[in-house]
């Protein structure tokens, strides 16, 4: 027994000696690499540190020094890669987290910088300034921005602020910059570009009216009414096939940016051609007259979760033979609910995955009979900026699905390109001769959109983005259930005030038709 204890003691002593020798060897190798770097012999330092890192793979110090050498060699991607490797070995390392956060900040990737800074209790803010100062009620602005001087800017606070500003919906562009102040503190500068017309007064009104003239429509908009973030939108369309008169008013409830209201009224007089309900040769013509009103509210429940609820009522009259329940005239009363939630983000790789889900319940009081309305829809959207800095390249993909029962045909899901439709298969027409009904229509649908954009022109107050797309989808429960696909290119002109003009040149792969379509909208 004594001999066993003696052998164990000798083994422990030998292990301790080997560990001490390894530490001494690692210190010497590290000192050699640092000395070469201080002499500006960066290539030699890189080779020496890399060889030593292979000898001591569990020592994060070599990776940290390699990151510094890569930075001096202007290899920023290599520096960030080495820092991430080092922080996997030593997650709480102050120097590594500070270094990596600073590199992300230089790239303009504030979320990634905060994801590293917050691990070590940084960055501490000296003050928050606005440049320029937003024309917004001071109480609204103070409550919308959830961080201030003397606080640590966390991802949680940043996300809560971004949600509040989204709900206010008065800024076309936002940018938050951090600059060192001293003593380890930072000054946060918020640059909030308001949604504005290129012209003011009479010329601004005329410009707003002229935007819709190519589409036989005029649109009036007023944003940030009385500096309280109330936004009003009015639309009049005199197209003989789809007349429309609509008004929408939205804004925060009281002076709380995390709660908002929305009131809308919508009147339509439309003529529809509905081919392929029973066979490809059948075309059913219908005239729809509908008036609708909706009142709703939006609530930010957490920094990432938004819930909206509304009550909607509408009355419709459908001229033509009532071939089934979908063509019955009458009243509808519904309650609609929706939640929006970012479900997955990789700030350092600039990837974001978001989702939303909606539920609608109600009653259709038709002339023939009354029936229950029940339906829902959901969406998952992925967005990736592949470059470490800037957004000249952007890849997007989205999946949508939904179903509803008990509603008239005009409440079905419509997948063709039409300005009144929320879901598009780009390249597939949604109207023929100006009449709705040409695209896939049904009580249930599946839609997948994909594409990428590249900035091809950037000048003051104007940006042009273009890129290819491929969309595919299927609607069932009304028209013949078939998969429709479209491919082509989309060009977007983004003006500084938040106005976007889009041109789509696509091909319907099922019908073999070329489709050209354009639209004007807001992009914030």
List each language-model region with its residue ranges.
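Periplasmic polypeptide-binding modules associated with outer-membrane biogenesis and secretion
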Residues: 50, 56, 61, 68-209, ...
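C-terminal outer-membrane beta-barrel translocator/porin domains of Gram-negative envelope proteins
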Residues: 334-468, 476, 505, 509, ...
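Gram-negative/organellar outer-membrane beta-barrel architecture
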Residues: 157, 161-352, 418-433, 438-441, ...
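Bacterial N-terminal signal peptides
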Residues: 6-15
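Positively charged n-region of N-terminal signal peptides that target proteins for export
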Residues: 1-3
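Boundary at the C-terminal end of the N-terminal hydrophobic targeting segment
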Residues: 16-21
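Alpha-helical segment of the N-proximal tetratricopeptide repeat
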Residues: 24-58
């Amino acid at each position: 027994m004594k001999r066993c204890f003696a052998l164990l003691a000798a083994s422990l002593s030998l292990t301790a000696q080997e560990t001490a020798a390894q530490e001494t060897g690692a210190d010497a190798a590290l000192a050699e690499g640092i000395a070469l770097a201080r002499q500006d012999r960066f290539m030699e330092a890189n080779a020496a540190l890399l060889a030593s890192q292979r000898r001591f793979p569990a020592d994060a110090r070599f990776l940290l020094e390699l990151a510094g050498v890569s930075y001096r060699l202007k290899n920023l991607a290599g520096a960030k890669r080495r820092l991430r490797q080092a922080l996997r070995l030593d997650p709480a390392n102050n120097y590594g987290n500070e270094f990596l956060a600073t590199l992300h900040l230089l790239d303009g990737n504030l979320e990634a910088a905060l994801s590293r800074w917050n691990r070590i209790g940084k960055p501490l803010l000296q003050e928050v300034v606005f440049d320029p100062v937003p024309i917004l009620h001071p109480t609204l602005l103070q409550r919308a921005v959830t961080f201030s001087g003397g606080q640590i800017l966390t991802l949680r606070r940043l996300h809560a602020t971004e949600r509040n500003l989204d709900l206010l919906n008065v800024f076309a562009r936002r940018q938050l910059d951090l600059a060192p102040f001293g003593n380890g503190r930072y000054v946060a500068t918020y640059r909030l570009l308001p949604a504005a017309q290129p012209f003011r007064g009479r010329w601004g009104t005329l410009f707003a009216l002229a935007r819709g003239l190519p589409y036989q429509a005029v649109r009036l908009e007023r944003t940030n009414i009385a500096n309280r973030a109330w936004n009003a939108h009015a639309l009049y369309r005199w197209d003989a096939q789809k007349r429309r008169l609509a008004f929408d008013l939205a804004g925060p409830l009281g002076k709380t940016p995390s709660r908002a209201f929305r009131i809308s009224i919508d009147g339509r007089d439309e003529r529809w051609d509905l081919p392929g309900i029973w066979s490809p040769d059948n075309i059913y013509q219908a005239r729809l007259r509908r008036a609708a009103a909706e009142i709703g509210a939006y609530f930010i429940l957490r920094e990432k979760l938004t819930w909206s609820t509304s009550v909607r009522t509408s009355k419709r009259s459908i001229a033509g033979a009532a071939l089934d329940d979908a063509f019955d005239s009458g009243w509808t009363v519904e309650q609609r609910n929706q939640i929006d939630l970012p479900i997955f983000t990789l700030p350092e790789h600039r990837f974001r995955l978001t989702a939303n889900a909606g539920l609608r319940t109600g009653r259709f009081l038709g002339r023939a009979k009354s029936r229950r309305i029940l339906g829902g829809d959901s969406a998952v959207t992925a967005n990736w900026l592949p470059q470490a800095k800037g957004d000249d390249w952007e890849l997007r993909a989205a999946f949508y699905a939904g179903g509803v029962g008990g509603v008239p045909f005009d409440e079905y899901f419509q997948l063709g390109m039409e300005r009144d439709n929320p879901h598009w298969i780009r390249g597939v027409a949604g109207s023929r001769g100006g009449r709705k009904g040409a695209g896939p229509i049904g009580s249930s649908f599946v839609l997948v959109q994909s594409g990428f954009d590249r900035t091809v022109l950037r000048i003051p107050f104007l940006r042009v983005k273009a890129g290819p797309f491929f969309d595919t989808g299927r609607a069932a429960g009304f028209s013949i259930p078939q998969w429709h696909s479209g491919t082509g290119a989309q060009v977007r002109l983004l003006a500084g005030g938040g106005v976007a003009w889009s041109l789509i040149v696509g091909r319907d792969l099922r019908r073999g038709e070329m489709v050209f379509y354009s639209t004007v909208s807001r992009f914030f």
